[in-house]
């Protein structure tokens, strides 16, 4: 049985402009991602590993729409992630998750772990009784 492609990343690139620290110093272009391509199939989970500074977080941020790519395309269920209608965008936001390598950047230290889990369950429309059992 052939599985459906749910996300496709084609020739993705992301550049950042680094401004000079001194007056008159030229800006530099930092190539964080260059020509990244892959497909994620239905039922798969993607894990990205690599050395510090290799672009893992930048790629993740592009996939969850926190950074706009400089080039290439990201499609989710056959639709361009950056140009999809609001309804589809909300569904994609529920389905695509990112776990940051630093827990302080992904969890709110003012909230309990159970509150954070419950909040995610509400987003995914898991009922109150099921939520309480878990």
Indicate residue ranges for each PLM-predicted region.
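ABC-type ATPase nucleotide-binding domains, specifically the catalytic core motifs of the NBD
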Residues: 17-25, 68, 80-87, 111, ...
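The feature captures the beta-strand-to-loop junction immediately N-terminal to the Walker
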Residues: 49-51
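Helix-to-loop junction immediately C-terminal to a conserved catalytic motif
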Residues: 64
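Conserved ABC transporter NBD signature motif
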Residues: 72-80, 92
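Conserved catalytic motifs of ABC-family nucleotide-binding domains
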Residues: 98, 103-115
